[in-house]
């Protein structure tokens, strides 16, 4: 009897599928059952060959050998995972296997992972595609009931292959040209270089910004703060200090008469469900998580815990077929702090609307929402708990009523000058009930006293206010993600068609790649962090001066993404696009070769490289200070200091760990110093002393909630006799 081979992207997903399909016989790198053999990749097992695979001369980096334009691309098995490739290949080629089910991640990159393995194995068997957004048992069972013909995804594979080949052609040639021309480790690409250019443009805006003083006028009555308003512009500020001074003299001791009281009921609806970029933004704002941290945490919640759906989605909507599963998902999250709201929603009719259910706005995957699987909250790490909390609250909020408040606007006159006072009264918390008070950003509007039109107030105190105009803020990871998603304001003379394309294709990069792009810029020392703010390094600034102009614009990436989209929709041939990339790479190399610019290492130190003896470069890595060899072929790196999560006992700021071996020492900007060995000893003693107190504190918190938390730890602690 013939069998099907199921190819998953990772072992964890493969084992989940195998369990559902009844594959219990353990093999080396696979599981087998009566009808199925389930095996898995380890991410990519096959990749594009390095340049030296086409010609041995490319093993050495020489400017005169560029551009490198292979007639046909070669693919090689990745050495470190070659053993697993052999296992997968053996299963695919088995004589008792008649069909292959591709069960890699449902997206462009997942398709590429599987197809390259299948092609490199030389197997020619019918393909089926498992396309699911979560890896719960229920989702897997449903997915296998509705497998699609693999040929349906041929264009998606062509698009993925075109993206991979184009990045090789442009990235390899541009990076080698810049590196050999200027003898420095310089890399560029179609997404990372325009991202770098946006950071540079923001820094230039800040540098060129000229702060100006502005002034205003506040009138204080007994219980209301009134703000002066220009009669024509309605602005509450002016750059003319003399005008405010004159108003203070003219209005001194004059009464204030209320001429109008307006009340309006306002509704605020819950924000949309999360896609990956929105979740990364929120996690960075609230917890300081990097984009990479959020994605890897989401991946664990999806793959290991199976409590959230597929993370790499660019949609904030659900498709109509998901609506029937919503009650089960609400039951799954009816635990701990979410129990009350979830059960309340389950009592009534679950109402959906086009604000979060829309088939037209879902492509490969719907928004990130909880699965039908109930988590054991105590099994989640601190980061996992925080990300899960964000997603569950956002999910619950879309079913809840809007936040309603009554806004009061009072207009008054002092002489001929207008003053305004605004306040609000909460009518109904609505969806904000799910959020704690300290999680909500206040708007500074207090509840105003009840007063009638025509009321005259005396004994008014006038106060001159002042401030200065502020420059744009430096990018942090949250705002940089927003800029990558919508880069149109950083484009010069871009056509409306290109702007539209960038909007349709999701901007620079994809939801799946943006975190890696930002991480790559940090790891190649093009950018660095100061606090939460992102700054260009000297290396990043010089790269932008040396890189071809066209490669720095988001416009080029927008054009490419549109073409890749056309390939996936069957409107453009892959070969045509790759041919255009060959021409572009030749143009880039020609431009770099002809440049007369120079590159200067501005961060040279007197420390010699322990490997080659050349002076090392001082760089600020994402997690601390490092020394890096300037020789690109040597590439020796040495950690000088590392920012840790340990807190200073004096000022509670994060401590920096310096030195090597037993002599390592924690240091703080406040001047605090402590040896690592002393720190570890102190922490160990604190842990012993605090264990009883910590348990009692935990139990008190559980009693406060008055609802049982879904936690094995809570049950165990309750039985302890302290």
Region locations from a protein language model:
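Intrinsically disordered, low-complexity regulatory segments
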Residues: 1-161
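Conserved short loop/turn motifs at secondary-structure junctions
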Residues: 1-2, 103-106, 183-185, 263-272, ...
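Metal- or metallocofactor-binding catalytic centers and their adjacent structured scaffolds
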Residues: 238-272, 280
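Glycine-centered, phosphate/nucleic-acid-interacting loop/turn motifs that mediate DNA/RNA or nucleotide
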Residues: 305-306, 525
């Amino acid at each position: 009897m013939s069998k099907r081979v199921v190819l998953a992207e990772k072992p964890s997903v493969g084992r989940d599928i195998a369990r559902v399909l009844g594959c219990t016989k353990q093999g080396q790198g696979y599981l087998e059952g009566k009808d199925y053999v389930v095996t898995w990749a380890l991410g990519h097992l096959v990749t594009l060959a390095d340049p030296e695979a086409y010609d041995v001369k490319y093993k050495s980096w020489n400017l005169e050998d560029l551009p490198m334009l292979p007639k046909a691309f070669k693919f090689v098995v990745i050495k470190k995972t070659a053993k697993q490739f052999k296992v997968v290949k053996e299963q695919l080629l088995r004589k008792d296997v008649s069909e292959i089910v591709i069960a890699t991640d449902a997206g462009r990159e997942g398709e590429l992972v599987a197809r390259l393995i299948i092609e490199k194995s030389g197997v020619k068997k019918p393909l089926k595609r498992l396309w699911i957004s979560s890896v719960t048992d229920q989702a897997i069972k449903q997915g296998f009931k509705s497998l699609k013909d693999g040929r349906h995804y041929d264009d998606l594979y062509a698009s993925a292959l075109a993206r991979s080949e184009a990045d090789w052609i442009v990235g390899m040639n541009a990076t080698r040209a810049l590196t050999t021309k200027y003898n420095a480790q310089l890399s560029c690409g179609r997404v990372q270089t325009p991202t770098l250019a946006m950071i540079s443009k923001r820094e230039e805006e800040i540098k060129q910004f000229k702060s100006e003083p502005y002034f205003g006028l506040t009138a204080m009555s007994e219980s209301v703060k009134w703000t002066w308003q220009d009669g024509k512009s309605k602005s509450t500020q002016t750059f003319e200090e003399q005008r405010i001074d004159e108003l203070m003299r003219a209005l001194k001791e004059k009464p204030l008469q209320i001429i109008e009281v307006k009340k309006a009921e306002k509704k605020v609806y819950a924000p949309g469900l999360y896609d990956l970029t929105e979740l990364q933004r929120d996690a960075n704002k609230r917890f300081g998580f990097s984009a990479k941290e959020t994605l890897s945490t989401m991946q664990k919640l999806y793959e290991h815990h199976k409590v959230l759906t597929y993370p790499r989605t660019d949609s904030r909507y659900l498709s109509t077929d998901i609506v029937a599963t919503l009650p089960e998902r609400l039951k799954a999250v009816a635990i701990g702090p979410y129990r009350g709201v979830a059960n309340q929603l389950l009592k009534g009719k679950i109402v959906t609307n086009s604000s979060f259910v829309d088939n037209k706005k879902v492509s490969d995957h719907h928004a990130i929402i909880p699965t039908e699987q109930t988590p054991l909250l105590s099994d989640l790490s601190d980061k996992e708990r925080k990300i899960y909390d964000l997603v569950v609250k956002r999910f619950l909020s879309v079913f809840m009523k809007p936040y309603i408040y009554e806004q009061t606007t009072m207009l008054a006159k002092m002489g001929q000058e207008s003053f305004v006072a605004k306040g609000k009264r909460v009518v109904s918390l609505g969806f904000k009930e799910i959020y704690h008070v300290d999680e909500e950003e206040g708007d500074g509007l207090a509840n105003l006293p009840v007063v009638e039109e025509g009321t005259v107030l005396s004994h008014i105190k006038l106060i001159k206010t002042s401030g200065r105009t502020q420059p744009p803020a430096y990018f942090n990871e949250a705002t940089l993600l927003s800029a990558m998603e919508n880069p149109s304001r950083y484009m010069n003379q871009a056509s409306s068609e290109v702007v539209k394309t960038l909007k349709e294709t999701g901007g620079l990069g994809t939801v799946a790649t943006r975190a890696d792009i930002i991480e790559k810029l940090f790891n190649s020392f093009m950018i660095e962090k100061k606090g939460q703010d992102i700054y260009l390094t000297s290396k990043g600034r010089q790269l932008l001066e040396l890189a071809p102009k066209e490669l720095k614009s988001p416009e080029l990436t927008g054009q490419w993404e549109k073409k890749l989209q056309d390939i996936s929709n069957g409107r453009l041939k892959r070969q045509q696009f790759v041919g255009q990339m060959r021409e572009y790479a030749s143009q880039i190399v020609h431009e770099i070769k002809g440049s007369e610019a120079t590159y200067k290492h501005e961060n040279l130190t007197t420390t010699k490289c322990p490997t080659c003896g050349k002076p090392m470069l001082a760089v600020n890595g994402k997690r601390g200070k490092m020394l890096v060899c300037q020789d690109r072929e040597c590439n020796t790196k040495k950690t000088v200091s590392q920012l840790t999560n340990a807190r200073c006992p004096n000022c509670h700021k994060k401590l920096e760990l310096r030195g090597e071996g037993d002599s390592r020492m924690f240091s703080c900007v406040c001047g605090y110093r402590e040896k690592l060995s002393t720190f570890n000893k102190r922490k160990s003693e604190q842990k012993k002393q605090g264990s009883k107190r910590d348990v009692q504190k935990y139990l008190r918190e559980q009693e406060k909630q008055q609802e049982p938390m879904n936690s094995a730890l809570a049950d165990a602690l309750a039985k302890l006799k302290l």
